[in-house]
């Protein structure tokens, strides 16, 4: 019996039972990290790694994905990340995803480790080749960006609507100028 990972040809074959998992904001200096899991109801066109899509295209695909899937989006605040650490937040997210999809057992997480959570397969760059992981990538990224756009209104000096809280040169210069705000991750090297 062939499995999803038997041949390269199968990477592009659609498996209706597969649940893709990805996160966005893992390396951001502020704001939440979002995790998403997605089980598509049908094959959707145009899906790929969210980082390779324009913001407009991600937004369009987000709406299509949520109408054609069973999905879960989780948020881990900067306070949770500082208190628990990234690994614990990621493990918690994977456990919550498994609990949400309790009758399912075909999970694929983008990356090289399942953090010790049984029943979750991993694949590096799965968001670029597996539709369900691409969909999860888009759900997580759009959710993260929407949160940062909303939070930017309360913290305009950090330009979160532009940098989405990632460690860009401009963002680091703003931290140096204004100091940190309550959204910044104190456990991260910010400068």
UniProtKB/Swiss-Prot annotation:
Endonuclease that specifically degrades the RNA of RNA-DNA hybrids. Keywords: Cytoplasm, Endonuclease, Hydrolase, Manganese, Metal-binding, Nuclease. Its cofactor is Mn(2+); Mg(2+). It is found in: Cytoplasm. Residues 16-191 form the RNase H type-2 domain. The keyword Transcription regulation does not apply. InterPro entries: RNase_HII, RNase_HII/HIII, RNase_HII/HIII_dom, RNaseH-like_sf, RNaseH_sf. One of its GO terms (molecular function) is RNA-DNA hybrid ribonuclease activity. This is Ribonuclease HII. Gene3D superfamilies: Ribonuclease H-like superfamily/Ribonuclease H. It catalyses: Endonucleolytic cleavage to 5'-phosphomonoester. GO terms for biological process: DNA replication, removal of RNA primer; mismatch repair. It comes from Campylobacter jejuni subsp. jejuni serotype O:6 (strain 81116 / NCTC 11828). Manganese or magnesium. Binds 1 divalent metal ion per monomer in the absence of substrate. May bind a second metal ion after substrate binding. A divalent metal cation binds at residues 22-23, 110. It holds the Pfam family RNase_HII. GO terms for cellular component: cytoplasm; ribonuclease H2 complex. Its EC number is 3.1.26.4. The keyword Nuclease applies. Transmembrane segments: none annotated. Belongs to the RNase HII family.
């Amino acid at each position: 019996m062939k499995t999803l990972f038997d041949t390269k040809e199968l990477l592009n074959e659609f498996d209706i039972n597969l649940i893709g998992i990805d996160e966005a904001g893992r390396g951001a200096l502020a704001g939440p990290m979002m995790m998403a899991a997605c089980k598509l109801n049908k094959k959707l066109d145009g899906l790929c790694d969210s980082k390779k899509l324009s913001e407009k295209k991600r937004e369009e695909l987000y709406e299509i994905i949520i109408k054609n899937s069973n999905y879960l989006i989780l948020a881990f605040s900067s306070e949770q990340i500082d208190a628990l650490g990234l690994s614990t937040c990621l493990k918690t997210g994977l456990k919550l995803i498994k609990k949400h999809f309790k009758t399912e057992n075909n999970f694929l997480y983008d990356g090289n480790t399942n953090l010790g959570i049984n029943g979750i397969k991993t694949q590096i760059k799965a968001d670029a080749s597996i539709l369900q992981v691409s969909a999860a990538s888009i759900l997580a990224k759009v959710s993260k960006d929407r949160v940062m756009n909303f939070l930017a209104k309360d913290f305009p000096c950090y330009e979160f609507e532009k940098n989405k809280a990632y460690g860009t040169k401009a963002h680091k210069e703003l931290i140096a100028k204004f100091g940190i705000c309550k959204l910044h991750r104190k456990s991260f090297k910010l400068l």
